[in-house]
């Protein structure tokens, strides 16, 4: 699974969806996604990440689809910062 970055329509907010691997298990499995969220103040500067949470893959997919319906777009502009 890969990392996805979405940016809002007005380009002021960002969400990063990435696989979350449990470290307590002997063999790490990816059964959850970590969703980090933050604000973009200037396009050429690093976004300020406000927090993150861990969701099931199904819940993360649902949120991802809802954000796309709201007009958020997939981007790779900030890939070098994460």
PLM segments and residue spans:
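Terminus-proximal functional modules
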Residues: 1-70, 75-82
């Amino acid at each position: 699974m890969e990392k996805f970055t979405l940016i809002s329509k007005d380009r002021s907010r960002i969400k990063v969806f990435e696989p979350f691997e449990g470290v307590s298990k002997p063999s790490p499995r990816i059964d959850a996604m970590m969703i980090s969220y933050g604000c973009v103040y200037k396009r050429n500067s690093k976004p300020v990440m406000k927090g993150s949470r861990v969701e099931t893959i199904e819940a993360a997919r649902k949120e991802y689809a809802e954000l796309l319906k709201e007009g958020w777009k997939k981007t790779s502009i900030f890939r070098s910062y994460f």
